């Protein structure tokens, strides 16, 4: 009877651990997408700064706009491709809650849907003039940067909590098996 109880408990630990591993996958993929976007933000800011120069020619502006649009398109691809098990935390998702122990405790991954919203906002920005580009830097770019930084901080902390809990459960399982 005691052995049967222990086997049941070990199977329950395995089920909780599997849920944590799935959540870690979702979180790590979203974190990678947000990090990729963060890496692109420096290049996007540079293009916006170049576009805010009133002394460039129409041909130069068109080349810079094409570069800017390509960078923003890549950022949008990071949002869409940050999917694990059909879940994309960076757009159109809800928070993910997963069991963290046998006492019904949970850990959460917070949906970061504003990342997708802000990327779409900057993608739709009008940058036909130097003044437009300066406005985009002050508004849309600032918003994207804030949202991505917040997503990196939140997702990083939540994935760390999932990692710590998984390690803890592994140690408990090892001690009882």
Predicted regions and their residues:
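Amphipathic alpha-helical coiled-coil/heptad-repeat segments
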Residues: 3-177
């Amino acid at each position: 009877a005691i052995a049967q109880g222990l086997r049941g408990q070990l199977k329950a630990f395995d089920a909780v651990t599997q849920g944590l591993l799935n959540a870690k996958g979702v979180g790590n993929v979203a974190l990678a997408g947000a990090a990729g976007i963060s890496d692109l933000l420096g290049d996007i800011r540079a293009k916006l700064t170049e576009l805010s120069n009133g002394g460039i020619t129409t041909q130069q502006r068109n080349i810079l706009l094409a570069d800017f649009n390509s960078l923003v398109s890549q950022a949008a691809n990071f949002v869409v491709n940050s999917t694990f098990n059909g879940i994309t935390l960076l757009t159109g998702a809800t928070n993910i809650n997963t069991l963290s122990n046998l006492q019904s405790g949970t850990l959460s991954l917070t949906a970061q849907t504003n990342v997708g919203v802000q990327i779409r906002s900057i993608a739709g920005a009008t940058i036909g003039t130097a003044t437009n580009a300066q406005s985009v830097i002050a508004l849309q770019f600032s918003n994207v940067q804030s949202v991505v930084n917040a997503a990196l901080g939140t997702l990083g902390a939540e994935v760390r909590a999932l990692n710590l809990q998984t390690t803890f459960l592994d140690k408990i399982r090892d001690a009882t098996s």
